[in-house]
Amino acid sequence: MGWSVNRPTGLTYHRAGLSTKGYTLFTPHGDQKTYLIGMDGQIVHTWMFDHIRPGYGRLLKNGHLLMTGSDINLKFPEPPGQGKSPPPFEERVKMLGGYHTTLLEVDWDGNKIAEYDNRFQHHDFFRRENGNTIVPVWVELSDEMTKKVRGGYKEYRERLPNLIGDEIIEVNADFEEVDRIRIWELMDPVKDPISRDVKRWEWTHVNGIDVNERGDIVFSARHNDRVAIIDAETHDIRWKYTKTHGQHNPTWVGDGNIQIFDNGHAGSRVIEVNPENDEVVWEFHGSPYPQFFSGHISGASRIPGGNVLVCEGTSGRLFEVTRNKEIVWEWINPFVNMTRGNPTTSIYRAHRYSPDHPALAGRDLDPERYGNLNRLNNLDTPAS
């Protein structure tokens, strides 16, 4: 779905009586800043990055920001021409969506606390209560495994490389590896083929992870249209869901249910699935269906109280929806940036934090501190 370049931006709609108070964190693609906005859509805090291109972040309870990013001096290789050999694995990963080189932790004022460099990490992360961090990483598969994997397509006269697969690693506070789960060993090369609209460069493309209190990991494998749960004790897959397309951001909600942003073919939806019986117990989609659509990136997070914050990533549209499927808050990204030579307003994901969240305790969240920035982007204009 397209949108007008003259569309309104900033806060476009708000029903204060039905929305959930809080502050929303997001990072526009191509920007050098991460932003925190209030319910009136105005910026109340920013973090500036000078040595990475920031990707996606989360606030920790101590007020630190944990952020993915890429080396600001990173050079992206050109795609190989017809009949040309593909670049080596370490260069090929730079061409993939969600690629990062860095996981950076900064304090409230942007001072570096810790930095983890791994040239094969991508997309997402999860910080455990014990301080360990879980991240997906890309690995190159063997000739034998590449031949076993079904599906996908190749372009005319394209020389295909070995497939890229996924592993999930856990590192401690000193960034020493303490665990590794090989997704490519858990998936079935025949029963979990590459989707037919995906090029045969990657098998799984893990783009989202979440961990419950027991330690079970739920992950999304976008290129297979799969969401799966890895058992904490056995490291085996104990549940697999196959009724989405190009999905993102699976999260644990409620009593063990899984919430998923299902990107879809011509319209997107947010669903809550019961893993015990695969029943979709809640669903939100556009009306008409194509009114809500993001073909890639995007996410949805459950807010305390039951509402859901949705990030329609491609368009840079954030909105809050109730359990009765009513949109009660909407904010559209006014920041236009350049990503790989193209203008964009997209946002990978967003999170809402309640006013009493520990990370916000004692913080100055007065939007007047950013008065000029808010006025410059018309963020100080109330929604009609």
What label would you give each PLM region?
Residues 1-384:
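Histidine-/acidic-rich catalytic cores in large beta-rich domains
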